[in-house]
Amino acid sequence: DTVTAISFDYGQKHRIELERVESLVDYINSTFEKPIEVNGETVYATIRYRQIKLDGLSSLLNSALVTGGDEVPEGHYAEENMKATVVPNRNKIFASIVQAIALSIAEKTGEQCDIAMGIHAGDHAIYPDCRQEFRDADDHAFRLGNWGSEKVGYFTPYLEGDKFTILQDGEVLCEE
């Protein structure tokens, strides 16, 4: 199986994820050169990485998280304090691009193509696009708007988890 990891450079101020993702993919690929058992199935982990640059987007968005935006609020992660960090429609933008890529792959190969988004519950209160309701509506719009969309699976495995849950899963996988 081949996994394509995708990150987006949309002019975000916090760059560490973009800086570290390539070395993480290299680490995973070198660690899992041999097959591993996942849910009773033998899997060869091959990960390709693509960074998609959304040049110019940050200048059009009103958010403290993008270059040219206000200062990122400090202090308690309270709803009112952190609303300035909402990047309008960010997860929809990402999902639309990833859905289009997955559908293109499915059409080209004739095989099912699954996507998994890292949207997580820790952000529900502040970011409306981190909720099950949003994910379901997004999936519905994708299915209505595309022929062959049944060939694309859409997973949000951390929608009920937080960043700590993601970290724990990563640690468990690295131990295996």
Task: Give, region by region, the residue ranges found by the protein language model.
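Nucleotide-activated chemistry modules centered on ATP-dependent adenylation/adenylyltransferase
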Residues: D1-E176
